[in-house]
Amino acid sequence: MENKKVIVGISGGVDSSVSALLLKQQGYDVTGVFMKNWEEDDTDEFCSAEQDIADAQAVCDSIGIPFKKINFAAEYWDNVFEHFLIEYKAGRTPNPDILCNKEIKFKAFLSYVHLLGGDYIATGHYARTRVLEDGSVQLVKGLDDNKDQTYFLYTLGQEQLRQTIFPIGNIEKSKVREIAKENNLVTFDKKDSTGICFIGERKFKEFLSKFLPAQKGEIHDENGIKIGMHDGLMYYTIGQRQGLGIGGVKDRPEVPWFAAKKDLENNVLIAVQGHDHPLLFKQSLQAIELSWVAGMAPADKFRCAAKVRYRQKDQSCEVEVNQDGSVNVTFDQPQRAITPGQSVVFYIDDVCLGGGVII
């Protein structure tokens, strides 16, 4: 550890602030780096980004470590945002946070860390690593199960994990805030960021319409009867209730409507009534673009647990790896609102095995 150089990604939030502090206390040579991944185009977003930079700088000054800024906006646009638009255009619902970790934080940033002569990269993710006797590294859930972020990190491989430290992986979120307060870090009571990093808190629909022309179409029930109009399939996600705009439909009970399926060919959104409507449930899925943390799948066929969305409880399933590398996943219990474009992530106990993109 003595004089090992760690470059920590400082976002201006409490998690990365405490990560930097703990590394400094543990005797590492620490530098904080703020990654700018998006060029803001509206005043509110700009002010919020400026505040994050100011907070990141203040934290580094307070801890007594150097602070740097790096602009990855071009890389982000090319490798994350354009993919995001392609997916939405195809009617899928991508997860840009997963792609951002893969392409920016643990690729572009990692290369930059090497340029700075860093031995390790560190982030404020709630995750852990475990080194096995054979030298391989496991990606392990964060101690705070409620905050575990391995779902977003499943694309990381051995090479990246060997060079990564997750300083708060062994700590509960409440304790992280406590540490920040005790050490007078300005971010101690800053609320957690929500929303996609490049949209922040602003209205998603409004944002997306700037980049993709929407094509309005009809909403049908499961029997093909028209019950309303949609603003563009890309604005809806499977299982969504809000914003469907289906009012009282003649001769139908006053039960909420949910988006169940997208018929891309005919530009039709299929909606059903009731949170637990059978059409919202599936017992199996197929996924592509698999990433295995160990470098390969545990076996051609194996049992494990899986999540089809962040913070979902682990669901028991069987995974079968196909010749082309894709997987078929069969769950013990039917799963609600499995969404194409989102990721399915696999676990055995607290170990994240990897995952793929649902089709």
Swiss-Prot record:
Pfam family, one: tRNA_Me_trans
Keywords: ATP-binding, Cytoplasm, Disulfide bond, Nucleotide-binding, RNA-binding, Transferase, tRNA processing, tRNA-binding
Enzyme class: transferase
Binding site for ATP: G9, I10, S11, G12, G13, V14, D15, S16, M35, G124
Top-level taxon: Bacteria
Residues annotated as catalytic: C100, C197
InterPro entries: MnmA-like, MnmA-like_C, MnmA-like_central, MnmA-like_central_sf, Rossmann-like_a/b/a_fold
Residue ranges, annotated region (Interaction with tRNA): 147-149, 309-310
Keyword Disulfide bond applies: yes
Alphabetical GO biological process terms: tRNA wobble position uridine thiolation
EC number: 2.8.1.13
MF terms (GO), sorted A to Z: ATP binding; tRNA binding; tRNA-uridine 2-sulfurtransferase activity
Annotated catalysed reactions: S-sulfanyl-L-cysteinyl-[protein] + uridine(34) in tRNA + AH2 + ATP = 2-thiouridine(34) in tRNA + L-cysteinyl-[protein] + A + AMP + diphosphate + H(+)
Cell location: Cytoplasm
HAMAP family cross-referenced by the UniProt entry: tRNA_thiouridyl_MnmA (MF_00144)
PANTHER family tied to this protein: MITOCHONDRIAL TRNA-SPECIFIC 2-THIOURIDYLASE 1 (PTHR11933:SF5), TRNA 5-METHYLAMINOMETHYL-2-THIOURIDYLATE -METHYLTRANSFERASE (PTHR11933)
NCBIfam families documented for this protein: PRK00143.1, trmU
Function statement: Catalyzes the 2-thiolation of uridine at the wobble position (U34) of tRNA, leading to the formation of s(2)U34.
Name of the protein: tRNA-specific 2-thiouridylase MnmA
